[in-house]
Design a protein with these regions (language model features):
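Short amphipathic alpha-helical segments
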Residues: 49-55, 172, 176, 180
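N-terminal Lys/Arg-rich, disordered targeting/topogenic segments
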Residues: 1-8
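Glycine-rich portal/gate segments that line the openings of hydrophobic small-molecule binding cavities
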Residues: 10, 14-18, 65, 74-130, ...
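Charged, low-complexity N-terminal segments of organelle-associated membrane proteins
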Residues: 1, 117-120, 169
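A short acidic/glycine-rich loop-to-helix N-cap element
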Residues: 152-176
Length: 209
């Protein structure tokens, strides 16, 4: 069934991409295209204390263990800000979209940090805007994370694809965020000894989802 859906998608993907490329070229040659604006909110619920969740979210060197679609390419310190950093990501689309939409680059400059509670990042690269991450205690001792994305697309091809494939791009975003929530949940559980889940098992399970 999954293979049949992929084949059906493959049959319509090429015309859509062709239309998007033509749209992008025409817009660029003809005088420009309004950028796509994305204003999305995502909520995660993690069964781990807020301080531990914040620590993991602030450790890009650990991210490959629990969020394989958000590939950390480079980490740089932020001058004059010991809590800040500049992280370059290569972001993979959902598997159903990867054949038509290439990975995109995000450069996240995290300069506003309220330890254990909040971070605010200025995003550049193929998207430009702001990502705010808020952490809250749950009554049961877990953590609620709220991501606020407000970005515009700067990559002309991705911008054009966004006009003709908006529902697909939203589904891809939701897939990547669900992967992150599930991966972080499993990673925290393993670290806290709630159950033994090796990092390689987390990555394998997510890759097959």
């Amino acid at each position: 069934m999954a293979e049949e859906r992929r084949n059906r998608w493959g049959g319509v993907a090429a015309p859509l991409v062709g239309a998007a490329v033509g749209f992008a070229v025409g817009a660029i040659v003809g005088g420009g295209m309004l950028p796509r604006i994305y204003d999305w909110t995502t909520e995660w619920n993690i069964d781990a204390p807020r301080a531990e969740v914040f620590r993991i979210l602030s450790a890009p060197e650990e991210q490959r263990h629990w969020w394989p679609s958000m590939i950390v390419e480079r980490v740089e310190p932020l001058p004059d800000n010991p809590d800040g950093r500049i992280i370059t990501y290569r972001v993979l689309q959902a598997p159903s979209v990867r054949r038509v939409a290439p990975p995109f680059i995000l450069v996240s400059t995290i300069g506003d940090v309220d330890r254990d509670r909040r971070t605010r990042a200025v995003v550049t690269g193929d998207l430009a805007g702001v990502l705010e991450t808020l952490l809250y205690d749950r009554p049961d001792g877990g953590t609620r994370i709220v991501y606020h994305w407000y970005t515009r697309v700067t990559n002309p091809l991705l911008n054009a694809l966004g006009f003709v494939m908006a529902p697909v791009f939203r589904a891809s975003h939701d897939h990547v965020m669900r992967e992150g929530e599930a991966g972080l949940q499993a990673y925290c559980a393993a670290r806290l000894g709630q159950r033994s889940v090796p990092a390689t098992d987390i990555e394998t399970r997510q890759a097959g989802s």
